[in-house]
Design a protein with these regions (language model features):
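Charge-dense, low-complexity intrinsically disordered segments
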Residues: 2, 95, 180-184, 249
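Short acidic, gly/pro-rich beta-turn/loop elements at beta-sheet edges
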Residues: 44-46, 82, 152, 178, ...
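Conserved alpha-helical substructure of the radical SAM core
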Residues: 28-162
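Radical SAM enzyme core and accessory elements
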Residues: 1-61, 283-373
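A short, flexible beta-alpha/helix-coil linker loop
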Residues: 89-92, 173-176, 243-244
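Short coil/turn linker and secondary-structure boundary residues
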Residues: 47-48, 96, 150, 173, ...
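Radical SAM enzyme [4Fe-4S]-AdoMet core and its adjacent flexible, acidic
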Residues: 188, 199-329
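Radical SAM/AdoMet-radical enzyme domain recognition
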Residues: 102-116, 123-240
Length: 373
């Protein structure tokens, strides 16, 4: 056994108290060891590739600055019942009033604010929330399943009120697989939503939630689909969050495996992706990786329509200027709080919690409420 990190912090999966921990390598696997005074000693896997983990783990004990993005959960309501959901509660008491949202916006110093949930389009006053955000000099985005965005008039209303961007979930391009993840085949509605966004908003992201053993084969298909939506689609975000909220099977995928999926889909190697981090062209930690697609060195022949390729000739190496991010979330018994900061893309606030990092919010408030679909 080899100690990779002598001291870090974790959360007890039972009482959620912050506790001391360390990270060790044992027989090629990476384990988090921690001891809660009330609930004893635990060992849980962090990564199955010790060499990979040693290359990407954070060595500085200095906490990085909070990201300049805020995600507000104004509601826990939703208009569908997915088999995977990190906030499966549907408590209307968690709805935030327009005044409460305004107070949050007044305290947030940065311009970019995302509204998620739940499903933000389930709130009848979402257009007013967007208008309020604009009036306070900020750029409003929504994180959505896209079902209501299949309505052209609704998209037009959101655009008129100042919606800046959309992150739309698309977990498969196959109806049967989408039914397994989302509860029903919503593919037609999601594709119509994308068409409407191209007409009215012209800026969106594609988000893919990976479930091990269910939609792994769809990763590359959705990734290449996102590339074909450029220049309207400006980012592709893939994540695996098996220990949060409602899950189909609770099976985890480690970041080394997620990067292998990305590398295979992009036509590069995992070592190429890690080299980008060494060159300062990508960010990487045990839970997340992010880079610009045009820096991956991936071939693009056949990925984009000829008309789009003609427009993108001016872009370096004829590659889409798209942000690519993959996240492999920790389970509740193996969270390294220091490393979660390296994968924290946003701060989070809802009616039940103050502003805090995304991962701390998910694990403290939803990590222990695992449900099988």
């Amino acid at each position: 056994m080899k100690v990779l990190k002598e001291k870090t912090q974790s959360l007890c999966p039972v009482c959620r108290e912050t506790i001391s921990a360390r990270v060790v390598a044992d027989d090629g696997n990476v384990l988090l060891e921690h001891q809660c005074p009330r609930h004893g000693v635990r060992r849980a896997p962090v990564e199955r590739d010790a060499e990979f983990f040693a290359a990407v783990m954070t060595r500085s004990r200095n906490k990085p600055s909070p990201p300049p993005y805020l995600t507000v959960f104004p509601t826990y309501r939703c208009n569908i019942n997915c088999n995977i959901c990190y906030v499966p509660r549907r408590d209307p008491a968690m709805d935030m009033s327009l005044e409460e949202v305004g107070a949050v916006l007044d305290r947030w110093p940065h311009p970019d604010v995302f509204f998620a949930g739940g499903e933000p389009t389930a709130m009848e006053n979402l257009p007013q929330i967007i208008a309020l955000t604009r009036a306070k000099g900020k750029r409003p985005y929504i994180v959505t399943n896209g079902i209501r965005l299949a309505e052209p008039r609704y998209v037009a209303e959101l655009a008129r009120n100042g919606l800046h961007g959309v992150s739309l979930s698309l977990n498969a391009l196959d109806g049967k697989t989408l039914e397994a993840t989302d509860g029903r085949d919503y593919l037609d509605a999601k594709l119509q939503a994308i068409t409407n966004l191209k007409r009215r908003l012209r800026r969106f992201a594609i988000c893919f939630s990976l479930v091990r053993g269910v939609n792994e084969a769809e990763f590359g298909k959705v990734f290449r689909f996102a590339l074909r939506q450029y220049p309207f689609a400006r980012s592709f975000h893939a994540e695996c969050l098996p220990g949060i909220g409602r899950s189909i099977n609770g099976k985890r995928m480690f970041l080394s495996e997620m990067l292998d999926l990305l590398a295979n889909s992009a036509g590069v190697t995992r070592s190429r992706l890690l080299a980008l981090a060494a060159q300062g062209k990508a960010t990487v930690g045990p839970y997340g990786f992010a880079a610009d697609y045009r820096d991956l060195g991936a071939p693009v022949t056949g990925l984009l329509p000829a008309a789009v390729m003609a427009v993108t000739k001016a872009i370096r190496s004829r590659r889409p200027d798209m942000r690519v991010r993959v996240i492999a979330g920790p389970l509740t018994d193996s969270v390294d709080l220091e490393e979660t900061w390296s994968a924290t893309t946003t701060m989070v606030v809802s009616k039940e919690n103050p502003v805090m990092p995304l991962w701390e919010y998910l694990i403290r408030y939803h990590g222990g409420r695992h449900e099988s679909a």
